Design a protein with these regions (language model features):
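N-proximal low-complexity "stem/linker" segments adjacent to membrane-targeting elements
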Residues: 1-27
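A conserved acidic beta->alpha catalytic loop
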Residues: 25, 32, 40-49, 66-68, ...
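Conserved nucleotide-sugar donor-binding catalytic segment
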Residues: 79, 132, 136-214, 218
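Short aromatic/hydrophobic "clamp" motif used to bind/position activated sugar donors
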Residues: 86
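The conserved acidic donor/metal-binding loop of glycosyltransferases
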Residues: 90-94, 118
Length: 256
């Protein structure tokens, strides 16, 4: 482990259209002590060529031998991480230039081992959607099981405090699964830095008539298969998540 180093976990799959802008947002950081760990999950587009165009020794590209999904891809990157701090950035999202500097200062100043920030949303062409996302100032274990308030692209934690995090091969909500692993440590809390330091890209998806059912099942699988909760408890948490998801949109998402 290297003191002060931030290991940035970036899974990629067919994001050649976006990944250059994402990587550039990392290069533009005012905090320069980082390593960007890109694990490509057998992309069939030009992702490799785009990544190779960046001549920066801090950028490290790895490849899965077969298409494995985001959970195992993140696990791979986490095993390669050498940093004191672990951060996450998907290959189509963007950081503001001060993201790492301000977040590390916030954590060091307050003695926090886990934090997250505010962010806004953009569309596929990087145009603002005028949606600003915040969250509770403090998230404890109880609140984390109610709903995942933490944006994956904003989260940072201390590797010294939590060690190596690995999750089960779950297809949906694998970012939530990482946080549930962190919250297994007694007394864990996540703290909000009230500053917009990231931009989340909303990409078009096909509309499904059974969207609610699929979302409910993905949460049930998260709590039952990944977090190993009994079926009844997993079903309860899945229901609670549906309710608090609506509350989160009302309370913490603002049209600007």
């Amino acid at each position: 482990m290297t003191d002060g180093l931030v290991s940035i976990i970036m899974p990629s799959w067919n994001t050649g259209r976006y990944i250059a802008e994402t990587i550039q947002s990392v290069i533009n950081q005012t905090y320069g002590n980082w390593e960007l760990l890109i694990v490509d999950d057998c992309s069939t587009d030009n992702t490799d060529l785009v990544v190779a165009s960046f001549k920066d020794s801090r950028i490290k590209l790895f490849h899965n031998k077969k298409n494995s999904g985001a959970a195992l891809t993140r696990n791979y990157a986490l095993r390669k991480a050498q940093g004191e701090w672990i951060a996450f950035l998907d290959s189509d999202d963007i950081w503001m230039p001060q993201k790492l500097e301000h977040q590390i200062d916030f954590m060091k100043k307050n003695g926090y081992s886990l934090s997250f920030t505010e962010y806004d949303k953009i569309d596929e062409e990087s145009n603002p959607l005028n949606i600003y996302v915040s969250g509770p100032e403090k998230v404890n274990r109880h609140r984390m099981y109610n709903y995942d308030y933490i944006g994956q692209l904003t989260m940072m934690y201390s590797a010294k405090e939590f060690g190596l995090i690995q999750i089960k091969d779950i297809k949906k909500n694998n970012d939530y699964a990482i946080r549930l692993q962190l919250f297994k440590k007694p007394g864990t809390c996540a703290y909000l830095l009230k500053e917009k330091l990231a931009r989340y890209r909303v990409r078009k998806v096909s509309i499904s008539h059974d969207k609610f059912r699929k979302k409910f099942k993905s949460h049930y699988d998260l709590f039952h298969l990944c977090d190993e909760k009994p079926a009844v408890i997993a079903m309860w948490y899945a229901c609670v998540n549906m309710i608090f998801g609506l509350i989160k949109k009302i309370r913490y998402e603002t049209k600007t």
